[in-house]
Amino acid sequence: GNEKQLIEIFQGVHPEDWCFGTYRSHLHCLLKGIPREQVMAEILAGHSIHLEFPDYRFYSSAIVAGGLPIALGTALGLKRQGKPENVWCFCGDMAAETGAFQEAVKYAWGFDLPITFVIECNGLSTNTPTHQVWGVPHQHTTIGETIWRTHTWAEGRVIRYCYDREDWPHYGVGQMVDFDQVGQAPTGERSDV
């Protein structure tokens, strides 16, 4: 999974910073300092893919690339108000290939906005290999990357890391988490899909 990379990235995220995540933001919430009981309550209430914690300046969207323009607007507002906070915008590799991402990076670069984009590349758009969607010959290689990598502004402002999905229970690996069992003694059995 991507736990190691996220732990490293969140060492640079401050409590006053703003975070915008994707539909897979459970760990992001915990690393931002949101109490696990609050995160778990939202997940169990059916809000797993759109976690919102305004008191912690944390927002997420289940729409691919949906958080990009909102994060960009937040960064623009912070700059206009002269505030010292930074915006952290997380997206997947498929979102990073969209026009919304390319435009957000270009606008942030042009106006030197306080935003860091983090591309979490697992080679998939939900379950479709990203490189096949765009006709790119190799996994973890993208066409859009060549655009923003040419800007010196992007150094440290566009972070891209790759990871492979492992055997942890989540969509696409054939295992699911049974939340009816949360808080009960583990049985040692896994539920296969």
Give the positions of each predicted feature.
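Cofactor-binding active-site loop characterized by glycine-rich and histidine/acidic residues
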Residues: 2-111, 132-136
